[in-house]
């Protein structure tokens, strides 16, 4: 209860175990692959959350889909502990590869209540027709920390690329996360994800680039700059 990390779970749709008061959340297990036509791949398990001091566990990757089916989605990253200084939420798992549609990435975990950065959103999986969408990055702590970057959209071979995920929101001091790039598509590219907003001293995240295709995807909008320094942000001051 007081010390210890969650177990790493490795079974079909396994969920990472929660940590003690001091420890890291367990990673989510990968979803099982499907070898049967028309059967969806298993979803990745969510990463376990930390309680007070510790980072969140990473989400598991989605399993690949059987012939003509959809891949499993990536699991969500676990949230960091409430008082975890400087530790990020867990990264979201990537979507699996699909013979039809790629799986969606799992969202990044949020930082602790006050200090820490958001976890990176998982990337969308490749699809023979349509790419899976990237997931949103996690939000930072209220006082210090930057938002997590959005995951990139997966590529779609014959149709559309997946959209990029949105960047996470920053804390009072920190930058918004960058939006994920849209995936390339044989027909049309996926749209880039919007950048996350900054609230005080920090820059808004950059919007993700649109994916390439017969018709290119639209770039994502940039996030708003912090209110203490104006919409232009303050380049170079914050990492």
Language model: regions and residue ranges:
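Long, compositionally biased tandem-repeat segments
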Residues: 1-239
